[in-house]
Each structure stands twice: as structure tokens, then as C-alpha cells.
Amino acid sequence: MTLRLLSLEDVKQSITMSQAIDAMEQAFIQLAQQQVKLPLRTAISIDEEKALTLTMPAYLAQDKTLGLKVVSVFPNNLTQSKPSITGVIMLLDASTGEPKILMDAAYLTALRTGAVSGLATKYFARDNANHVAIIGSGAQSSTQLEAMTAVRTIKHVSIWSRTMKNAEEFAKKLESQYDVTIHEQVSLAIRDADIICTATSSSEPLVHLSEIQSHAHINAIGSHSRTMQEIGQDVLGHSTVVVDQLEAVLSESGEIIRAVEQNTLKKENILEIGQWLLSKELDYKNHSTVFKSVGLAIQDLSVAQVVYRNALKNNLGIDFPIN
């Protein structure tokens, strides 16, 4: 038995953003068709390090994608000049259970998070949308913008970040391609935007109804716990709300949990993107829409499967004998 090992560069060469968006669409359709097995993620806390390790398995029956992602969050690593978040994705042979490929998870996590926003933007943002606001300038900001440019012709980029230095560095990378503006207030960054991408760890709402366009589409991917929220209750109550998975969002998304508890948003009115993709009956492109994603293992494995196929096709990686 051999296990193929991919370097970060191998992974980057083996998938494009457009391929990742297509993989997201197929994964969520399979979820809606109940063709996936998606157990709850398992967390192990390492108290003495104030750290956490998460294990996220999944199986997509249609294309026989079986595997898991393991991610560790060790904040103290920063004192050793090591990344605080590390992880791997392993795919298994769905016929034999044998492990077949191992790859770094950090890049693919950012890519698939961008890709799911790209998928939502493809179907819910105006066709002529050309102005995007990126709220937050961390690891997700680049792939969020990359995904927007994969599905819309973006001309203007507005940036807001709590850390001005990060915003300036991000903007510098974009100046040759877009009309870029850095704003000191979120309200100024979002007021003219057709598309808003929030990728922050905020515990207080950043986006409010009076500050956005009536047709704005919002991708909210930063908050992933009950104590975090990026989108105001007034926005959620006024908009069509679409989520990756209702069960996951009602467990992990602070703003959605609050909106449902306060009856600002009715649970039965929340759309799951996979269910909508099955019919595509209603067009929301001229309305205010919010897409909320907390991340699912099927997203990781679906992009990893694309990487696996392309790596084999292009003979990338090395085979390591393990027995």
C-alpha cells in the first residue's frame, strides 16, 4: 500500500478557483439529495496549550469521495515562529478503505471558503455587479476576492480591516488590477458595494441595513461560534438568508442564532443552498441576500478530490510506501 504525498505547490497546481466553485455546487447538490454522510466534527481541547484539534470526516456517495480533515489551532505556536493553524486532508479509497493521498489543509480551506462564496455570488448577486467590499484582511480575504472575480467582472474593491497595515498590504497587491480604496469605517466600505464579503472574528455586528445597497449580496464567512456575529439583525430580517447547512448554522453562527431566537428571522424561511440548487425556481438577484457559511467537511473533501484527480493526471506528488 502506498500513500501519495502532495506539497503545497503540488496542491496549488492541481486546482483552479473555477474548478473549486464547480466542486462546491456538486457537493451541495449531493447534500440536498442526501447522498452524503456528514458526522458532526469532533473537537479535542489541549488545555495546557489552550489549543484545539478538530477532526472532520465525510463521504460523498455520488463520486465516492471518502476522507477527513484534521485541523489544529495552537495559538502559542506564534511564539515559536510557527503557524497557529495547521492541518491535513486525507482521502481514502471508498472501495477498500485504504488511504490514498495526503495534502496540506490550510490552502484548500481558504480556497474552498472562497469557492462557496463564489458559488453563492454566482447565483444570488446581480449579473452586472462590479463593486466588492472585503471586510477583514486575513487569510480569507484573497480567496474571497479571487472567487468574486471568477463569477463577476469586478472593477472596484473597497477594503476595511481593524489592522490598517494588513489592509494596506492587501490593497498594494490589487492596485494594478482594480480601483482599490481603503476605508477607516465599515459603513464607508460597504455603502456602494454590490457584493460584500465579511471574514472577521467580530463579536459585534459590522454590517447594518441602512448602510448597504438594496440589492447587495453578502457573503458572511467569518463568524463560527455563538459569541461571534458580523451581520446586523436588521439586515437578516430584511434579506433572503441562504446557508450552507441549516443544522450547522443554527449551532455555530452567532448572528443567525440570535435572529431566530429574537424572531427577527424565521427558521422556516432560511434557504439551504443545496436545496435551492436542485430547483433554482426563484431569482433573488435584485434583492438583498445574505449567504452564511460555517464550513462543512464535504467542502474540503470535494476540492481535495479535484486535486487528487489532477495530481494523478499530471503526475504530481510522491508515492510513499507505508507497509
Label the predicted regions.
Residues 141-142:
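N-terminal Rossmann-fold NAD(P) dinucleotide-binding loop
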Residues 229-323:
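Adenosine-phosphate binding glycine-rich loop
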Residues 150-174:
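NAD(P)-binding Rossmann-fold cofactor-contacting core
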Residues 137-138:
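Glycine-rich Rossmann-fold phosphate-binding loop(s) that bind the pyrophosphate
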Residues 124-131, 213-214:
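Short helix-loop-beta connector
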Residues 177-261:
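Rossmann-like adenosine-cofactor binding region
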Residues 132-133, 289:
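Conserved beta-strand elements of the Class I
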Residues 1-109, 118, 128, 298-301, ...:
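N-terminal ligand-binding/catalytic initiation module
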